[in-house]
Amino acid sequence: MAASSADKSRPLANFSPTVWGYHFLSYTPEISSQEKHEVDELKEIFRKMLVETCDNSTQKLVLIDTIQRLGVAYHFDNEIETSIQNIFDASKQNDNDDNLHIVSLRFRLVRQQGHYMSSDVFKQFTNQDGKFKETLTNDVQGLLSLYEASHLRVRDEEILEEALTFTTTHLESIVSNLSNNNKVEVSEALTQPIRMTLPRMGARKYISIYENNDAHNHLLLKFAKLDFNMLQKLHQRELSDLTRWWKDLDFANKYPYARDRLVECYFWILGVYFEPKYSRARKMMTKVIQMASFFDDTFDAYATFDELEPFNDAIQRWDINAIDSVPPYLRHAYQALLDIYSEMEQELAKEFKSDRVYYAKYEMKKLVRAYFKEAQWLNDDNHIPKYEEHMENAMVSAGYMMGATTCLVGVDEFISQETFEWIINEPLIVRASSLIARAMDDIAGHEVEQQREHGASLIECYMKDYGVSKQEAYVKFQKEVTNGWMDINKEFFCLDVQVPKFVLERVLNFTRVINTLYKEKDEYTNSKGKFKNMIITLLVESVEI
């Protein structure tokens, strides 16, 4: 029989305090008319260049790639879409290129845009045994392009699996001997390939790489720098508004046991969408993800089971009249939760979009039920569930099903009811993203969690059910992550249903965030190191013009 939670001590996690506090409260930068005018002028220069450069040319491929990597492609969505479609159509008629760099670059750009280009284009670079020709090892640019292209593979694309192995091996062997700028670019790619890179982080790093390239276009570089700084000011203002909201809620004092990570939550959502048109959605989503983080800590690292039962029930009811049944110390949090979604409804009602909030509530309730299920297992004499049962619940408690749905609520674009129904029914891309999030989170944090009273992680469940070592479990989970990325790629060009590409891109970007923050350790929980530096790079330090 389960022990009474009244007899148990609270499973305190002793999370580290906030790094930032209310630091961004005073950030209220203004975007000058001069800045905006300069960016607009440069934007038109490159819009014209995109339109006038022949689609079926090397110059066009390089221009699109450079614009995308510098983080300014959002200004030219229509022009780039039209160009890539034309490039894709032309490639079906004429595929005589034998330049590894160009073939790889075209392949990556076309697949990134959501078109299925066959990986057979790389057969010309292989021997009869299917191995890539050793003569290619002298072509550093070609190797790097093929390496980047290989990350757009789907399952069972053996030629791209071989490409990844071949390029990784050779790039790792030569990187230390490359010139400085090439060394930086190759090292960055080996650490974080383009497909897995947060667009904003990638842009900031590529600005420096591009600047050190002797052949750079100085106007394009200036455009990227000005645009980066102008966007940064917008992001700082948003974060200032959110900091004021967070300070007024006073969670840091009322709930000191929980991770105080408002700035880190904003960075997370900035990774999902950084463009100006998503400003409202970013602010809405940051509030939601900070609340989800709070609930995670409450269910996992503070509240007793006797407190969690009525709290979960109240959230499932989603009714202010249920507040009296909530443990007194959690009533403030319950009120805050209802207020966030009520404000969403009021804001969206002006545009006749308030029905979207139903789906956001649905997913938050589902997330909290998953947190509660884990608390039930722990309360039941630390019951260790079967791996498959735990995996199904853990895919939800990872939070990415909730995130994939809720991040769409505040966007300006039209989203049909069918798209919302599709996404809450856990399509492959959402399940793959959630699996990656859960697997990377568990690999990075399960040993720390086991140092306190905590339910078994997926890794412990897998080890117990299959009688394998921790290292074997790690290999299994890393394989799941790799497969998850290939499934995400597949959904971009193999979907049977009509889902807007920007919806798929949000899920992709959520996955990029987890890949960035949990690659080596749990940077979100331990936010004083690399995560702090990333925030400084994107939200504190401007780019020198």
From Swiss-Prot:
GO terms for biological process: diterpenoid biosynthetic process; terpenoid biosynthetic process. It catalyses: (2E,6E)-farnesyl diphosphate = alpha-humulene + diphosphate; (2E,6E)-farnesyl diphosphate = (-)-(E)-beta-caryophyllene + diphosphate; (2Z,6Z)-farnesyl diphosphate = beta-bisabolene + diphosphate; (2E)-geranyl diphosphate = terpinolene + diphosphate. Pathway: Secondary metabolite biosynthesis; terpenoid biosynthesis. One of its GO terms (molecular function) is terpene synthase activity. The keyword Ion transport does not apply. Keywords: Lyase, Magnesium, Metal-binding. It is an enzyme of class 4 (lyase). This is Sesquiterpene synthase 12. The gene is TPS12.
